[in-house]
């Protein structure tokens, strides 16, 4: 590995999260999902005449296909910044859910809105958590397909959300017995690398939309991951991916771990909590998820010894925290005793809850209460979701200790180190001055009285004199 190569230790990244939504009263559906989703977005539509907007923090909020609220973080350039802005989306959605409940009450409809940060519903439909990483054009898609995919396929062992797989949603050989799996997303992925997102659901989407200078960058769109409730799980998921991308850019080779059949292997791994399910490699050798992850973690520790420190980006100290957690999780799984990570990793936390109910009541995984727990774990509503309740009581680990006020502030304030700052500042001034404007990831536009727009193709730049001039023109009206 060579730190002299074009390695992005400061990398632009973001997360897009689709949420499940229901409205219940006394355990029964009170409002249909389509209707409650529209009610959730009514304040947005009433104000902006659209259910697809960019927010004051520079992110994006919209109602996706299938009545799924979706939040995309603004561009972030460090691990902790991304985790804060991912949580900030929950703040925004919880505000909307509170307003929706009050609106229902005004209509004399009793109902509680639930927002699930998960990846599958009770009918077996899947919705995503998509990770976006900016990479240079110098790194070839073929190399990513061969050497990044083995990491992505096996990382469910260290950061899966956990899931009771039901017969209708399992990819099985006729066995219809429900089973606890590592990943919610694994059974819904069918290809390694593809330009599709919904039809075939690849691990890496190759549709070339960099939202930046296309001659310099590409946006790596990873759609295989589970949504994370736990901050430590999210930190491990994102942080380990950042390290692997850095190592690939630095010239490290992981071609010995190229997997022969990615779509089958990702399912096999998901059903084996020990990490020892057979993984046939392209070379003909048989490995397992545990061995592959151990190899990546060992290389990551070596990389940290030469990783350059940037003024911005994720500090080496935070990356060392990631590697320490990575090794801790793998050691626990290797030993067969996961008690040391029972407050750190989503699939372990959830499994322990389910195990306790099974031990107490003798239920098997078909019991409706256990299936309810599977979903309630992911409810982001304060005081309603299982995980957030555990977090409030200090029963699970935090990566962002003491950051609650920063998370709340981030719902309305953009990152100060990326292009999102200009977008957020522009929108704030426009809204405060009732100006007719529009934005997207790369453009700012004043619509009236004289149309004027600029393209911002450098996502690393937090300042541009042209953006300052546009803001000044609004203030000078």
UniProtKB/Swiss-Prot annotation:
GO BP annotation list: modification-dependent protein catabolic process; proteasomal protein catabolic process; protein pupylation
HAMAP family according to UniProt: Pup_ligase
Active site positions: 64 (proton acceptor)
Molecular function via GO: ATP binding; ligase activity, forming carbon-nitrogen bonds; magnesium ion binding; ubiquitin-like protein transferase activity
Designated name of the protein: Pup--protein ligase
InterPro entries cross-referenced by the UniProt entry: Pup_ligase (IPR022279), Pup_ligase/deamidase (IPR004347)
Species of the source: Corynebacterium kroppenstedtii (strain DSM 44385 / JCM 11950 / CIP 105744 / CCUG 35717)
The protein's Enzyme Commission number: 6.3.1.19
EC top class named in words: ligase
Leftover remarks: The reaction mechanism probably proceeds via the activation of Pup by phosphorylation of its C-terminal glutamate, which is then subject to nucleophilic attack by the substrate lysine, resulting in an isopeptide bond and the release of phosphate as a good leaving group.
Family membership: Belongs to the Pup ligase/Pup deamidase family. Pup-conjugating enzyme subfamily.
Residues that, per the record, bind Mg(2+): 16, 62, 70
Pathway the protein acts in: Protein degradation; proteasomal Pup-dependent pathway; Protein modification; protein pupylation
Role this protein plays: Catalyzes the covalent attachment of the prokaryotic ubiquitin-like protein modifier Pup to the proteasomal substrate proteins, thereby targeting them for proteasomal degradation. This tagging system is termed pupylation. The ligation reaction involves the side-chain carboxylate of the C-terminal glutamate of Pup and the side-chain amino group of a substrate lysine.
UniProt KW keywords: ATP-binding, Ligase, Magnesium, Metal-binding, Nucleotide-binding, Ubl conjugation pathway
Residues involved in ATP binding: 60, 73, 441
Catalytic reactions of this protein: ATP + [prokaryotic ubiquitin-like protein]-L-glutamate + [protein]-L-lysine = ADP + phosphate + N(6)-([prokaryotic ubiquitin-like protein]-gamma-L-glutamyl)-[protein]-L-lysine
Record flagged with keyword Nucleotide-binding: yes
């Amino acid at each position: 590995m060579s730190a002299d190569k074009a390695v992005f230790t400061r990398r632009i990244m973001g997360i897009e999260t689709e949420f499940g939504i229901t409205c219940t009263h006394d355990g029964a559906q009170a409002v249909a999902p389509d209707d409650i989703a529209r009610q959730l977005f009514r304040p947005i539509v009433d104000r902006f005449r659209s259910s697809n907007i960019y927010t004051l923090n520079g992110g994006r909020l919209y109602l996706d296909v299938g009545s799924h609220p979706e939040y995309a973080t603004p561009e972030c350039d460090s691990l902790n910044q991304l985790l804060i802005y991912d949580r900030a989306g929950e703040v925004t959605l919880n505000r909307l859910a509170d307003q929706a409940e009050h609106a229902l009450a005004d209509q004399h409809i009793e109902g509680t809105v639930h927002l699930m940060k998960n990846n599958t519903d009770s009918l077996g439909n899947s919705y995503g958590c998509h990770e976006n990483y900016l990479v240079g054009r110098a790194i070839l898609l073929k190399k990513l397909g061969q050497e990044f995919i083995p990491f992505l396929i096996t990382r469910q062992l260290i950061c899966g959300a956990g899931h009771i797989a039901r017969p209708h949603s399992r990819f099985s050989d006729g066995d219809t017995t429900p089973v606890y799996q590592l990943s919610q997303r694994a059974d819904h992925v069918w290809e390694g690398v593809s330009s599709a997102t919904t039809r075939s659901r690849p691990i890496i989407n190759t549709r070339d939309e960099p939202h930046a200078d296309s001659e310099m960058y590409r946006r790596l769109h990873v759609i295989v991951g589970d949504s994370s409730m736990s901050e430590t799980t999210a930190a491990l998921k994102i942080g380990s991916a950042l390290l692997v991308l850095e190592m690939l850019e630095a010239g490290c080779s992981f071609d010995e771990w190229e997997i022969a059949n990615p779509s089958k292997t990702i399912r096999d791994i998901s059903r084996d909590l020990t990490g020892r399910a057979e993984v046939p490699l392209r070379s003909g050798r048989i490995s397992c998820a545990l061995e592959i992850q151990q190899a990546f973690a060992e290389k990551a520790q070596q990389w940290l010894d030469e990783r350059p420190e940037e003024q911005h980006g994720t500090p080496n100290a935070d990356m060392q925290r990631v590697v320490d957690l990575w090794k801790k999780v793998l050691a626990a799984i290797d030993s067969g005793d996961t008690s040391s990570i029972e407050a750190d990793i989503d699939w372990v936390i959830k499994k322990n809850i389910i195990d306790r109910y099974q031990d107490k009541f003798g239920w098997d995984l078909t019991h409706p209460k256990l299936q309810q727990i599977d979903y309630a774990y992911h409810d982001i509503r304060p005081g309603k979701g299982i995980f957030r309740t555990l977090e409030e009581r200090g029963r699970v680990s935090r990566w962002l200790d003491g950051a609650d006020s920063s998370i709340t502030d981030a719902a309305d304030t953009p990152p100060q180190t990326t292009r999102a700052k200009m977008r957020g500042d522009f929108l704030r001034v426009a809204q405060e001055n009732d100006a007719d404007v529009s934005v997207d990831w790369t453009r700012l536009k004043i619509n009236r009285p004289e149309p004027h727009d600029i393209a911002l193709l450098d996502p690393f730049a937090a300042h541009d004199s042209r953006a300052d001039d546009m803001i000044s023109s609004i203030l000078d009206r």
